From Swiss-Prot:
One of its GO terms (biological process) is spliceosomal snRNP assembly. This is Gem-associated protein 8. The SMN complex catalyzes the assembly of small nuclear ribonucleoproteins (snRNPs), the building blocks of the spliceosome, and thereby plays an important role in the splicing of cellular pre-mRNAs. Most spliceosomal snRNPs contain a common set of Sm proteins SNRPB, SNRPD1, SNRPD2, SNRPD3, SNRPE, SNRPF and SNRPG that assemble in a heptameric protein ring on the Sm site of the small nuclear RNA to form the core snRNP (Sm core). InterPro entries: GEMIN8 (IPR034754).
Length: 234
């Protein structure tokens, strides 16, 4: 019992350390937000269910209209209208619901045609004035779009050169080539060293070469891996 109490006290002391105070603050805020979200969702569902306009799917399936019966409004129609409806239902191969479904798209098509005609009158852009501010806005929008496109290209190129953490430090994703070199090995580096250090270029290059050889020796012996860097992309 004493060992168990000591272990619980150790865990409590670890979690109540002042270093983790900010973490627990964020944790409690997130839990409070989650509870308020669940409460709001439950209230919304209850308000929809208790609404007088809410009809479950089972009620709609059992309604007289779904079964092919007549609604109270249709009962108040004249006998001639009801007789016409009966004659339409008595025709073979042309039931009533299918006729209603064919009439409704035609009516919607007429409404859409009338709305499109109205929009053609309202959305007349022949007399639209393009100001300097509008031109500047279009130019800035195009510039931002071009910058975003270039940024996407750079991200894609950087992603191709990305090396996973399970590879070593000398992982070459481009692969080896059997073609002869286009220039002498070390010629470009030697010219760069001479441009940077002048007369002392040979001595400094020898020191860098010795340091690089020592680094390669330790890498071959230890075989280190890359430290995993996980980017956060929201």
């Amino acid at each position: 019992m004493e060992a168990k109490s000591e272990s619980t006290q150790a865990s409590e002391s670890w979690s109540s350390h002042p270093v983790y105070a900010r973490y627990w603050q964020h944790y409690h805020q997130a839990m409070a937000w989650m509870r308020s979200h669940q409460s709001a969702y439950q209230k919304a569902v209850e308000s929809v269910v208790t609404s007088p306009w809410y009809y479950p799917a089972t009620d709609l399936a059992q309604s007289p209209a779904a079964k092919g019966g007549t609604s109270p409004k249709s009962r108040s129609k004249s006998p001639s209208a009801s007789g016409d409806a009966c004659r339409r239902r008595s025709r073979p191969g042309k039931p009533g619901p299918q006729r209603r479904s064919t009439e409704k798209p035609a009516r919607f098509a007429e409404d859409n045609d009338s709305e499109s005609d109205d929009c053609g009158i309202v959305c007349d852009l022949s007399n639209m004035v393009i100001t300097d501010e509008l031109r500047q806005y279009f130019a800035e929008t195009e510039q931002h779009r071009e910058e975003l496109r270039r940024q996407h290209q750079l991200d894609a190129a950087r992603l191709k050169d990305y090396v996973n953490a399970d590879h070593g430090l000398y992982c070459d994703k481009r692969g080896r080539s059997t073609l002869p070199p286009t220039e002498r090995p070390g010629e470009r580096r030697q010219a760069e060293m001479k441009r940077l250090y002048g007369a002392s270029a040979a001595k400094i290059q020898a020191m860098e070469t010795a340091m690089q050889l020592s680094f390669d020796k330790h890498c071959d012996r230890k075989q280190p891996k890359y430290w995993p860097v996980i980017p956060l992309k929201f």
